[in-house]
Every structure is written in C-alpha cells, then in structure tokens.
C-alpha cells in the first residue's frame, strides 16, 4: 500500500508539475501573442503613413507631368464622373482652401481643361464644364494616372492588407 500511495503521489505530483509547467507555457504564450499582436497592430497603423506616402507620390508625379495640383486633378475627375456643375456643388466633392479657390479654377481654365459659364438669370452662379475638345488629353491623363497607380499597386496592397488586419 505504501508503494501504491507513493506511486499515486508520484502521479499526482507529476500532474501538478505538468499543470504548473502548462500554466507557465500559457502565460508566456499569451505574453508572446500579446507582443506579436501589439507589434502587428503598430505595424498596421504605421502602414497608414506608408499608404498615404504612396498616394501623395502619385499626385506629385501627376503634378510634375501635367502642372496641375491635387485639387485640380480631383476637380477634373469629378467633372468626368458627375458632369458639369456649379462651383458650389463642386465644393461638396473637392475641398479647395478658400485662398486657393479662384487660382485653382482659373488655372484649369488657362490650361483649357474646363470652361466657365454664368447663367443669364443669376450672375453670381458659375457653372464649370469639361472642355470636350480635350477628350484625347483626358484619355492620356487617365492612362498616366492608371500607370502611376499600377507601378505602386503591390506596395499599396500590402500596406492596405496590414491596415485592415489591425
């Protein structure tokens, strides 16, 4: 009986030791997992800046090639998608700083991308239209933008995946 009790105690002792070891492993695993989650979370959040940098570099490339600001590009894209509209309506789609507003639209007029129209019944309203004579230039600009995006697609997708994983 003594031997059986010793054996039982040995088994119980091993079980207790196993539980202690298991608890130690679980605690360390949780700390490791927490650290990994925190590192992955931090990495994912930092990818916001990386993605923003890629987007900014696309607009910089367009600006360099076409001598148009980000706002001017967005105005054109909005006109192509939505059609002609008043300046006030465009303000809902593209944010242009008040001190840059006149210069922004006048630059697009000077470059002949758009033209302005004032209705006879309301001289205060200005409607902007895309200049359909620049249809070929529109296609070229869209191709340029598409190529700029495609050249960064993998990097931007990786950043986006890391962000979404947060």
From Swiss-Prot:
Source organism, top-level taxon: Bacteria
Gene label: rot
GO MF term list: DNA binding; DNA-binding transcription factor activity
Role summary: Global regulator with both positive and negative effects that mediates modulation of several genes involved in virulence. Also, modulates the expression of genes not previously implicated in pathogenesis.
Expression induction: Up-regulated during anaerobic growth.
Entry protein name: HTH-type transcriptional regulator rot
Start-end of DNA-binding region: 87-110
GO BP term, pick one: response to stress
Organism: Staphylococcus aureus (strain COL)
The family this protein is said to belong to: Belongs to the rot family.
Pfam families documented for this protein: Staph_reg_Sar_Rot (PF22381)
Keywords: Activator, DNA-binding, Repressor, Transcription, Transcription regulation, Virulence
């Amino acid at each position: 009986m003594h031997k059986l009790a010793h054996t039982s105690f040995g088994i119980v002792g091993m079980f207790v030791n196993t539980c202690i070891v298991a608890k130690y492993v679980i605690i360390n695993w949780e700390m490791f997992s927490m650290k990994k989650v925190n590192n992955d979370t931090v990495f994912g959040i930092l990818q916001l800046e990386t993605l923003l940098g890629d987007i900014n570099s696309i607009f910089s490339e367009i600006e360099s090639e076409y001598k148009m600001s980000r706002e001017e590009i967005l105005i054109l894209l909005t006109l192509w998608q939505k059609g002609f509209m008043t300046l006030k309506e465009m303000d809902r789609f593209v944010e242009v700083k008040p001190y840059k507003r006149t210069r922004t639209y006048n630059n697009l007029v000077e470059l002949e991308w758009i033209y302005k129209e004032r209705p006879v019944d309301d001289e205060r309203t200005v409607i902007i239209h895309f200049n359909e004579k620049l249809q070929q230039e529109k296609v070229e600009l869209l191709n340029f933008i598409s190529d700029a995006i495609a050249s960064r697609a993998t990097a931007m997708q990786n950043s986006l995946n890391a962000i979404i994983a947060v």
